[in-house]
Every structure is written in structure tokens, then in C-alpha cells.
Amino acid sequence: MGRRPARRYRYCKNKPYPKSRFCRGVPDAKIRIFDLGRKKAKVDEFPLCGHMVSDEYEQLSSEALEAARICANKYMVKSCGKDGFHIRVRLHPFHVIRINKMLSCAGADRLQTGMRGAFGKPQGTVARVHIGQVIMSIRTKLQNKEHVIEALRRAKFKFPGRQKIHISKKWGFTKFNADEFEDMVAEKRLIPDGCGVKYIPNRGPLDKWRALHS
């Protein structure tokens, strides 16, 4: 018996069932890489950010996440170059799905017990996604806006249900508004730190604040 189609595992019916010492023998997830492109680009290089947002409460298989990642990456490399973007998959497949294998050969009724002891063995992993949760994000330069929308639109076809494409008002992968970001950096309220930023609050020892602004 082959793999069941993923539509059998689309809906979130049971509680989360992660890999643990009670749930052993779980096959590895198909998706192993969650960040692609120019991961080490500084925060000020890629101000534009686009999100793919789920519109349903459902389960997405690790195979679907991997297929969407490859699809978006291939299009962005072709249109923006391999150093012109940074893709981040925001879901991780931690929920284990099970299968109660049934024999379909002759004399199967003598070998198996039907629905007695039907808990099932681990078959694969899925990610549970809520309404409004971000599935995938891409940050890039402002002139690549149309390419980001097209890459996410193509990746949408790898998932069941409905997803929305949203161009963020934030700067890159940070939580600060794009129209205020550069002013906050100039005032030293934000310090660039890799692909993120450190926020410097107005509270704390005065000598630290003076040393920063001297």
C-alpha cells in the first residue's frame, strides 16, 4: 500500500501530536532548509517584504512546504538573481500523522484484526496553520515588488485551501514601520544587527545612553 493522498490529512481534527519519547520512529520531514537566497544581507539592503498568509485553519504537509519553497526560489533566482532576495519559510512541520495499514491481499482477514488496535504508525509530518498566520516571507529591494507577488502566487498552488499575498508595511523582516525605520536608525533608537535590529529603549542608565549618542 502506497502513501495516502495528503487531502486525507488536511483538517486539524486532533490535538498536536509531536515527536517525543512516546511517539518514536517518525520519518524525517521533507523540508530541511527554511532560509534561502542571501541570508546574510544587512537589514537596510532589503526594505520590501511580502508575506503569504493562510486564510484557513488546516494542516500543510512537509512535502507541500518543500515544493512551495523550491517553486518560489526558482522564480526569484531567475528574475532577481541569486543574491537579490531572502526567502524564509515560517512554518515547521512538528505534527506527526499516522496510518493504520490495511492489507488488501487474499486471506488478509486471517492476518489482520481490522479496526481493533487501530491507533496507527507514524507516516509523516505536517505543519498546523491558523487563519492569518504567515506561511512564507520574502524580503528584497523595492523595485522587485512584482517579482515577489508572482513568486508567492506560484508557490500558492502547492498548498490546499486559500492563501492571501500581503505586501508588508514593515521594513524587511523587522516589526518596525518602513516610513519610520530610517529616522529611528538615524536617532540611534534602532541598531542594525544582521537581518534584524536591536531596539534601544529610552529607559536605563544615563551613562549608557550618553555613550551611545556621543
From Swiss-Prot:
Q: Does the keyword Cytoplasm apply?
A: yes
Q: Glycyl lysine isopeptide (Lys-Gly) (interchain with G-Cter in SUMO2) cross-link located where?
A: 175
Print the keywords alphabetically: Citrullination, Cytoplasm, Developmental protein, Isopeptide bond, Ribonucleoprotein, Ribosomal protein, Ubl conjugation
Q: Where is this cross-link: Glycyl lysine isopeptide (Lys-Gly) (interchain with G-Cter in ubiquitin)?
A: 188
Its job? Component of the large ribosomal subunit. Plays a role in the formation of actively translating ribosomes. May play a role in the embryonic brain development.
Q: Which domain of life is it from?
A: Eukaryota
Q: Which Pfam families match?
A: Ribosomal_L16
Q: State what protein this is by name.
A: Large ribosomal subunit protein uL16
Sequence similarity:
Belongs to the universal ribosomal protein uL16 family.
- For whether the record's keyword set contains Zinc-finger, the answer is no
